[in-house]
Each structure stands twice: as C-alpha cells, then as structure tokens.
C-alpha cells in the first residue's frame, strides 16, 4: 500500500491526469444503477495521493502553486461526469437526422464544463492541505462546498452529487433526513477518503476510529428509523399511476395522437387491482397529453366522462397562454393540470426550473444568430412558471408537484414541501432509454421523499413510475418500458425528522466544521515548519 501511494504521489504530466481521470470514472460506480459504493473507497484515496503530489512550484505565485491541484480535480471531474452523464447523448439520437451533430457537444462538453467545479473543489482543499487527517477534512470541505455551489450556479445542476453514493438502499438513506445533502456530501467524501490514511503512521488510529464511528452512526440511525413504528395514518389516498410507454418517435405525430390519448384513457379506466379501491387520484406523466387542450376541448369532455364521481386526474400537459396555437404571442408552459370529474381544469402548476437548451434557449436572441435554436428539443420553446403551489386533492390532501428534473434540487423541494402532504413528480425519461440516466433520476427523487418525510408519487412516460414511502422504501413500481398502471393506497402520516431550515443549518455546520478542522491543522503544520 505504501509503495502504491508513493508511486501515485510521484506521478506527473499525462500520467497524473490519466490516473485522476480513471479515478473519477471509477467513482461513478457508486451511483445508480450500479450502487457499488465500495469503488469510492478506491477512487477518493487515489485522489488524495494525487493531490499530495500536486504541490506546484514552491517559489512560484499562489496561482502556479495551486494550478496542479486544480488540474487533478478537473481531470477527476471530467472522468466522473463523462462516465456518469454519457447517456445525455441518447436524447439527441431520438431525432438523429436533426440533432446528431450536437452529440459531441452534449456528451463531452457538459462533463468538460462541470469538471471545473471539481477543479475548484481540489483547489480549495489544497489551500487547506496538511498532512494526514487534516487533508481528508480539507478535501471533504472542498467537495461539500462545490456540490452546494453546483446546485444553483449557472441555473444549477446537482446531478449525481457524491453524497448519493453513500445512500444506495433505504437503510443508508435515513441520515440525509438530518444532515441534508449538504452535510451528506461532506461526510461521504470524508468517509470515502479515509483509507488514504492506511499508509500514514500518524492519525491512523484516529482515522479508523472516526470511520467506525461515522459508519456505525450512518447504519445505526437507518436501522433505528426503519424499525421504528410509523406514525398512525391520519387519512389515506387511493392512487393510480399510469405509465403509457409511448414511443418518442410517435409522441407528437398528429396521426397517432388519438391512439395515444386512448391508451391513457384505457389504463386510467381499467378495474382496480385486487384488494384496492377505486382510485381517488389518477396521475399521468410529464407532457403525456399529446395535444393542446385549447385545440381539443373535446378531450376534456372525454376525461370528464372517464372520471368517476369524486375522482381527480393530475396530468402533465403543454399549456398555452396568450392566444391561439397560431398566434405569435402565445406562450407555452410545461405544466401539470388538475382535472375534476366534470372535465374541468381546476388548477395548473407550471414548471419553474427549465432545462437550459432542452426546454428553452439561454440568451436566445444572441444564439439564434448563430443557428443554435435547433438545439431546443420538443415541439415548442417553453416559458418558465412564476411560482409553485400545492394542488388540493380529494380528502383535503395537498400535493406539491415537481416536473422532470426539478425534483433533483433539494432546496427547491424542501422550501415548498412544508405546505403539502405528498410530493408528486411527473417526468418523461424516455429520451434516455434504458441507460443509467432514468435510474439516477429516480434515486434522486427517492431521496427527496426521505429528506422531507413525505410520500412520493412518480409518473414517468417509460419508467420508472413508482410510489415511495417517507423512508425511501419502494411500495410499488413499474419497470422501464413497461406499459401499465399501479394502484396503491398511500397513508398520509409522514413528517420530516427535522425541518428543512434545521436540515440546512445542520449541513452548513457540518461543512464549516470540516473547514475549521482543515484550516487549524494547516496552520499548525505551517507553524511547525516555520
């Protein structure tokens, strides 16, 4: 082990970059669908040893001293995001004749840009670097800070945050209800990096003790919470989730729209599964209705005829506002609408956090001059909604809807979840087929249920549609590409272990604690040297 660490530390040039790239790619095995988190106990010690050797020129400027550490982090991040996000290119192959040219920009360009975050993480860590356990604390702080920044800078994209690798199963998910993702990211990197101390004499026992303590607390809290009796349900809701498995090549084909709509109606109207009552709520996926209701008011009549007394449908739609379909001043929203048993739209919630280049074109007027408008997928460019609110369901239950990747933002969900008893996530991951993408998306939605102590109802066009309880356990689900519907009675009893505000404070305190430890040990080492 010491010989291996020594050889890693002495690497430089392309060899150092290659090992950093491979270490980052290896860390992706800790994410869904692989969930092989043991790989992170190899990749992060490798990163620590690479940073040990990334000292720069001692007589140079601060920039020159830190540049090698930044480069190591960038290469680690490039490997991590390239191996973890390659599936994004699948969306461009759905209409390959039009979008295939952009494949390299998506598959390579996005990881290239995101890698700068991890370069910044290792740069920050190197500023606080010291020997032994101090550098582990510094690295944990650097990644924790960077993962937090990744959640909101440049519109935010906290996909595959390192902390998810420490939560592959419900037993290991419960801690996030207290630490939040901010704290979980810090603690995960710290734990994954501790094996780097196996080659050190000093702090080895302390590192081993901290590893046992933190790992035991992580597992123990999960065991206690899962074993604890659930709070008695105040009420329940009979839910049907529909997964139509519509082929994207037909999604907006006018000649098959009626057939798609008939499929949705048929799955919604079928008899309840044995042991289940009539659904009070039916849930359809994102943009599941293949036309505008302004163009097809008869569709609302058909929905009113299909829904029984007291039933409600929540459906993902493209919603038009401001004119007719031919109007140049019309605005379109990626929305969910609530429809009652009379075929009336009683509520609508528009997607607030749109996907850049996927649902709208940033700096559109400028980029249109360069012909980049065609990067925007789908039939229209969407406008962002102004606010999100809970939808009232039968029985006085309130559900908070999140459309597609909105659910990956912990703070976005936590801010609003206090006003609801259910989290609803509608999505269309069919763009990415049976690649790691839909599994990663589902895992992040699953964690939102645990964080907020609320059941999650998820409808996806081609999967994964599921009901998840407040402790992250999958009650029922439909696999990718399966067509069907699931009926579940959802007890309404969950509540967060701590409030969203307290969870955020806890995470920030954990991050600051590791920054303080790293800084103090760095100062102590400098004083000893001088």
Swiss-Prot record:
Keywords: Acyltransferase, Cell inner membrane, Cell membrane, Membrane, Transferase, Transmembrane, Transmembrane helix. It is an enzyme of class 2 (transferase). One of its GO terms (cellular component) is plasma membrane. It is found in: Cell inner membrane. Gene3D superfamilies: Carbon-nitrogen hydrolase (3.60.110.10). One of its GO terms (biological process) is lipoprotein biosynthetic process. Pfam families: CN_hydrolase, LNT_N. CDD domains: ALP_N-acyl_transferase (cd07571). Pathway: Protein modification; lipoprotein biosynthesis (N-acyl transfer). NCBIfam families: lnt. PANTHER family: APOLIPOPROTEIN N-ACYLTRANSFERASE. This is Apolipoprotein N-acyltransferase. It comes from Mesorhizobium japonicum (strain LMG 29417 / CECT 9101 / MAFF 303099) (Mesorhizobium loti (strain MAFF 303099)). The gene is lnt.
């Amino acid at each position: 082990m010491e010989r291996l660490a020594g050889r890693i530390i002495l690497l430089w040039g392309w060899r150092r970059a290659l090992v950093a790239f491979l270490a980052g790619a290896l860390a992706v095995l800790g994410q869904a669908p692989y969930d092989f988190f043991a790989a992170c106990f190899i990749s992060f010690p490798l990163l620590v040893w690479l940073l040990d050797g990334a000292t720069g020129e001692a007589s140079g400027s601060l920039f020159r001293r830190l540049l090698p550490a930044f480069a190591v982090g960038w290469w680690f991040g490039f490997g991590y995001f390239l191996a973890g996000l390659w599936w994004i290119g699948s969306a461009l192959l759905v209409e390959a004749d039009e979008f295939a040219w952009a494949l390299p920009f998506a598959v390579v360009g996005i990881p290239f840009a995101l890698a700068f975050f991890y370069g910044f993480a290792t740069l920050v860590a190197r500023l606080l670097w010291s020997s032994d356990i101090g550098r582990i604390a510094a690295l944990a702080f650097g990644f924790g800070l960077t993962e937090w920044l990744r959640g909101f800078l440049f519109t935010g994209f906290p996909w595959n945050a390192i902390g998810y690798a420490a939560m592959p199963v419900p037993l290991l998910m419960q801690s996030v209800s207290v630490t939040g993702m901010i704290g979980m990211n810090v603690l995960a990197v710290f734990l994954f990096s501790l094996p780097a101390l196996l080659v050190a004499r000093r702090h080895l026992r302390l590192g081993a003790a901290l590893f046992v303590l933190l790992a035991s607390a992580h597992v123990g809290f999960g065991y206690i919470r899962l074993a604890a009796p659930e709070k008695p349900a105040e009420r329940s809701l009979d839910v049907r989730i529909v997964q139509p498995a519509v082929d994207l090549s037909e999604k907006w084909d006018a000649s098959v729209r009626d057939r798609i709509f008939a499929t949705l109606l048929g799955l919604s109207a079928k008899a309840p599964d044995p042991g289940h009552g009539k659904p009070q709520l039916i849930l359809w996926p994102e943009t599941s209705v293949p036309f505008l209701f302004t163009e097809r008011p008869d569709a609302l009549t058909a929905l009113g005829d299909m829904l029984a007394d007291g039933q409600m449908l929540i459906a993902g739609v493209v919603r038009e506002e401001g004119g007719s379909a031919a109007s140049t001043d019309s605005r379109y929203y990626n929305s969910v609408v609530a429809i009652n048993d009379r075929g009336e739209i009683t509520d609508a919630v528009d997607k607030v956090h749109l996907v850049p280049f996927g649902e709208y074109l940033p700096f559109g007027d400028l980029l249109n001059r360069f012909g980049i408008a065609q990067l925007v997928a789908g039939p229209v460019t969407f406008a962002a909604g102004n606010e999100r609110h809970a939808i009232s369901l039968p029985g006085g239950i309130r559900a908070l809807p999140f459309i597609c990747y909105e659910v990956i933002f912990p703070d976005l969900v936590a801010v609003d979840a206090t006003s609801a008893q259910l989290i609803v996530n509608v999505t269309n991951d069919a763009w990415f087929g049976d690649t790691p993408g839909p599994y990663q998306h589902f895992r992040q939605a699953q964690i939102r249920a645990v964080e907020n102590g609320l059941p999650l109802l998820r409808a996806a066009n081609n999967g994964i549609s599921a009901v998840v309880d407040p402790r992250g356990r999958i009650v029922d689900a439909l696999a990718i590409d399966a067509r069907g519907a699931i009926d579940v009675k959802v007890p309404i009893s969950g509540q967060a272990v701590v409030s969203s505000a307290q969870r955020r404070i806890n995470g920030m305190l954990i991050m600051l604690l590791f920054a303080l430890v790293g800084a103090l040990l760095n100062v102590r080492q400098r004083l000893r040297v001088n």
